[in-house]
UniProtKB/Swiss-Prot annotation:
This is Dipeptidyl peptidase family member 1. It is found in: Cell membrane. The lineage of its organism: Eukaryota, Metazoa, Ecdysozoa, Nematoda, Chromadorea. The chain crosses the membrane at residues 32-52. Its main location: membrane. Removes N-terminal dipeptides sequentially from polypeptides. Essential for control of distal tip cell migration. Residues 53-799 are lumenal. Its EC number is 3.4.14.-. The gene is dpf-1. It comes from Caenorhabditis elegans. GO terms for biological process: proteolysis.
Amino acid sequence: MTAEADLLEGYDEELGGNESQKRDCKGITTAIVVVLLILVMIFAALVFFTPLFAAKSFGSWRLNVSDLRSLRYPYAEFAFTDNNAVVMQSWEGVEIVEDGVSRLIFGRENGAEITPSADRKYFAMMDHAPNPGMNPQNETFHLKIVNNNERLNPLLPFEVEELFRELSDSRITYDIGLRKEESVIQAFKWNGKFNDFVFVESNKIYYQSSPEEEGLTRVSNGGEHTVDGLFDWIYEEEIFGRKDAMWWSTKGDQLAYASYDNHLTKNVSLKTYHRLEPYPIDTNFHYPKTFAKVLPTYTLSIWNKKTEQSRQLDVQLKDSLSYHYLLAVKWLEINGTEQLVSVWTNRYQNEVALTICDWDTAICRLEFEYKYASKRWVTHDDFHSITSFEDTLFFLLPHDKRDNAFQQVASLRLSHGQLRTPKFLNLGEYDVTSINGINKETRTIFFHAAAPKPSHRSLFSYSLADESRNSAYCISCSIKNCTWAQAQMDDQMKTAIVSCKGPAAPHTAIVNLTRMDSDKKTEHANLLYDKTYQNRVEEAGLPVIIKETIKISDDFDALIKLSIPKDIYNRDKHQAIPLIVHVYGGPNDQNTKEATQIGIEEVVASASQAAILRIDGRGSGGRGWKYRSAIYGQLGTVEVEDQIKAIKVVLRLYRHLLDARRVAVFGWSYGGFMTLSMVNEAPEQFFKCAVSVAPVTNFAYYDATYTERYMGDAPLESYSDVTKKLDNFKSTRLLLMHGLLDDNVHFQNSAILIDELQNRGVDFDLMVYPNQAHSLSSRTSHVVGKMTHFLRQCFYTDK
């Protein structure tokens, strides 16, 4: 029973007893003293245990869980209309921006995914269908298409018109699928040119000419083991980043689609637990792990809308008997003809083959082969943005420069099956991350690059008219507060929408790519100004950011980003505060990017009055292959060393501000693996505590595609196993958190770790989340609360 309850009980007894007249001043004084002591204790507790859900606390701002959503930029997926207006997705639904003013054109209902047709006459609404076992491969949805009629009266306020629509039920809705409202759809794709579409149901692709038309055309013949138009788990997670495996041609008259055979791929089994269900539900899905003998095999087909015929393509690779991943698919105009380009890579992802596919012959002829130098690899990012101009293709390859090599734009002139060597654009020493496209009138190519600094992401242009000189021009550099930019272009590459993610409040600019102002800078203006959002970010009191480059060896530097609560940084007398090292450390990751970063670590640090340190060392991206290659074949080694070295330097440089006796490390997924590895490799008691969420404990337990990309054909003995060296956890407190339904990093990893910690007699904290996957997204509040309580105990209570 609490102290407050005890006090109230006693107080009630005094009021109701027969001896109230016998109370003297001493008794009253004692009661008052007790009450005052309780009030002091409550006040002290409020100061010490900063509430997670209070907006402000005693004069200084504290971030809370709700800020994770309210401070997130509310706009995404921008697209141009025919009259140069801009359509975008927002929390509320689909909005259109005209002359700097936005209005809602289609509202979001119950969090449904909304996809507009090419002319925005129709909107597809996708609501998730029941999935009792929560199987990631069984995710389906109910699909409705709404006829979004033209405005009834342009003079009416939009909200009034929306109310009228609801009352009059003026919008016509169409249920899509073989069984209409009873159908569960696996994937859906509008034609980018017209209002027709395709969808996948029961592993087969179907075509419908318009929402109003009842007739369906079956495009493919998938079944129980052959799946058409969809990617399996490993392709969705590690290569394409999406579920559908369908590509409409630009003209809208052909559809390319991928198919795979899954009956030989091994399954992983997870369990879900439901109230009043006597038995758990088993969830089985295909997940080939490292060293797996069988990987999913994919084929590529084209369906012709005019003839209503499908043809499986004969992909002519030199080593056709070996296993190949499908890496990229894109329709491109080559010499005035639209053709399908497909890119393939070997199992270890260090060789690529590019083919051009023809409908008439049903052949994909080999046009380009490339073998990567030692300790280098290909990713989907290098070819997903492939583009063309006349008879030349442009994509990303490593370009050797002095003592380094950078991912840069390579051009390949096609020669009908005669293999040629690509040439590189004349660029500086920086990594190009993606190609946006080419303005064919001005012969200008646009791309994103990690420049002018490695921690930046900027939009560049480059003139193909004179490739003898470096004509690269940074477009987004002239936009204020835009060190981390993401751009979307119109079809003619004359206008760009640039989403600026930092370093301050995110915002969006619209850029005229064909005109320069008086300072020879590209003309730009705000797409829209969301004053409410801007004020919210400014009032949030985001931490002060310190960025440094520190030496960790003769050949390598580490980039660091130190975040300090603003009220602490501005104090006259600095008192050393705890430090939370937020680590990820995975291949090609950038943790010190100059963007506004507001994650759960910011909320926890705010509640704990601690600083956050992020570090990029060897293995990180943005600084060429010299850094990327360093971890090849040895995950969990040099990147761990660099983190520990950098922490030591930072603690020395900022010893007036950071308390070296109160250092915690926190990481999720690969970061969870890094957290455990760093505690193992650091000096004893270097870390006071550690939080590891959903960690990999040995990459032999992880998926083959990811692991073998970075480990190659290294034997099992070369794999780091964090469970082999756990003695430091006897002096470093550990909080281990994992979802039991994690389909990405299986709980198997934590189970093996738990077993070994118990064998060694290590005391640790454990929090498991039933029915929760890798992100624990529906348990964010609980995760933050548990982490905050754990770290506050570590920093302020434990000795």
